UniProtKB/Swiss-Prot annotation:
Residues 113-125 are annotated as: Flexible loop. Its cofactor is Mg(2+); K(+). Catalyzes the formation of S-adenosylmethionine from methionine and ATP. The reaction comprises two steps that are both catalyzed by the same enzyme: formation of S-adenosylmethionine (AdoMet) and triphosphate, and subsequent hydrolysis of the triphosphate. The gene is MAT2A. This is S-adenosylmethionine synthase isoform type-2. HAMAP family: S_AdoMet_synth1 (MF_00086). Protein expression is regulated by post-transcriptional regulation: in presence of S-adenosyl-L-methionine, METTL16 binds and methylates the first hairpin of the 3'-UTR region of MAT2A mRNA, preventing recognition of their 3'-splice site by U2AF1/U2AF35, thereby inhibiting splicing and protein production of S-adenosylmethionine synthase. In S-adenosyl-L-methionine-limiting conditions, METTL16 binds the 3'-UTR region of MAT2A mRNA without methylating it due to the lack of a methyl donor, preventing N6-methylation and promoting expression of MAT2A. K(+) binds at E57. One of its GO terms (biological process) is protein hexamerization. Belongs to the AdoMet synthase family. The modification Phosphoserine is found at S114, S384.
Length: 395
């Protein structure tokens, strides 16, 4: 059941097909704990002061959470309470799990935003004309292979982790703990630049568990209650390989097993290795940080192009300079899946979207305290967010 120990299983891969793999991590993964705490801090400020300037990094290790960063805000935030509630929600509520929100130490090293940055970016400017908070390049990607316009590999990897959390919280699998990782390999066929998923080739699940449960029971439950509940049956066949709890034991997890840092799961947060990534992380940052707001806008552009039928798969790049409001460059790559040229698509994008941060914030409602929800299971492909609602394009 658990595949060959040497990993790769050379089942015949047909000509014109290829394998692609994406991973995801659960809420209790140490890096994801940090992302969620950073965004909980951001939300706490935005609830009281929608114009708060927040850059909050989190570090987690056994029994300790450290907040470090720069925040300028009119809000009065109880950081101890915000951090502990975030950890409690994730499920680390007892020292037997390796971490406990009630007893962990919360260290705060937060300062004001640099006045040099403030005067260069937003002071004495109309909101529409505020500058980008930093230089950088961001990408948005969309593909017609799923209803969400996301790669199937990352959609399934996220859903497996979400199902683990659901079965842990509702008591169906009481041996589950909050830390988990999943990885999904899909066999694809190329179709004139677009990609068509044919089957799931390999699934990996590693999830933290209590001392009592036996390996066979875990592997059986992961296959029957998690994988079969999440992965459509048409993608599974007798050649699908499963690596379920491949290390054999995963009792020590969360920040006790590994140190955690905000911003170390940027591929999990985006497209699972598809498209491209400019390197900037999302969590703990307000909308003036284009790492976040422009990546959300680029996804909005990409999804609008695909849902509008203008192409089947597309990559959008934007770039910025600190203090400059308009993007320095906008580029569109349609992989040959459009009737229109990339230049024509670029003109449509320029006509329909204003990619200044001070306009993105209005169009996507980015002053609302919605960010903690984005910090697990991916920022894209989930209906509840404004950047996932395609814009009707005029051209």
């Amino acid at each position: 059941m658990n595949g060959q120990l040497n990993g790769f299983h050379e089942a015949f891969i047909e000509e014109g097909t290829f394998l692609f793999t994406s991973e995801s991590v659960g809420e209790g993964h140490p890096d994801k704990i940090c992302d969620q705490i950073s965004d909980a801090v951001l939300d706490a400020h935005l609830q009281q002061d929608p114009d708060a300037k927040v850059a909050c990094e989190t570090v987690a290790k056994t029994g300790m959470i450290l907040l470090a960063g720069e925040i300028t805000s009119r809000a009065a935030v109880d950081y101890q309470k915000v951090v502990r509630e975030a950890v409690k929600h994730i499920g680390y509520d007892d020292s037997s799990k390796g971490f406990d929100y009630k007893t962990c130490n919360v260290l705060v090293a937060l300062e004001q935003q640099s006045p040099d940055i403030a005067q260069g970016v937003h002071l004495d400017r109309n909101e529409e004309d505020i500058g980008a908070g930093d230089q950088g390049l961001m990408f948005g990607y969309a593909t017609d292979e799923t209803e969400e316009c996301m790669p199937l590999t990352i959609v399934l990897a996220h859903k497996l982790n979400a199902k683990l959390a659901e079965l842990r919280r509702n008591g169906t699998l009481p041996w589950l703990r909050p830390d988990s990782k999943t990885q999904v390999t899909v066999q694809y066929m190329q179709d004139r630049g677009a990609v068509l998923p044919i089957r799931v080739h390999t699934i990996v699940i590693s999830v933290q568990h209590d001392e009592e449960v036996c390996l066979d029971e875990m592997r059986d439950a992961l296959k029957e209650k998690v994988i079969k509940a999440v992965v459509p049956a048409k993608y599974l066949d007798e050649d699908t390989i499963y690596h379920l709890q491949p290390s054999g034991r995963f009792v020590i997890g969360g920040p006790q097993g590994d140190a955690g840092l905000t911003g170390r799961k940027i591929i999990v947060d985006t497209y699972g290795g598809w498209g491209a990534h400019g390197g900037g992380a999302f969590s703990g940052k307000d909308y003036t940080k284009v790492d976040r707001s422009a990546a959300y806008a680029a996804r909005w552009v990409a999804k609008s192009l695909v849902k509008g039928g203008l192409c089947r798969r597309v990559l959008v790049q934007v770039s910025y300079a600190i203090g400059v409001s308009h993007p320095l460059s906008i580029s569109i790559f349609h992989y040959g899946t459009s009737q229109k040229s990339e230049r024509e698509l670029l003109e449509i994008v320029k006509k329909n979207f204003d990619l200044r941060p001070g306009v993105i914030v209005r169009d996507l409602d980015l002053k609302k305290p919605i960010y903690q929800r984005t910090a697990a299971y991916g920022h894209f492909g989930r209906d509840s967010f404004p950047w996932e609602v395609p814009k009707k394009l005029k051209y």
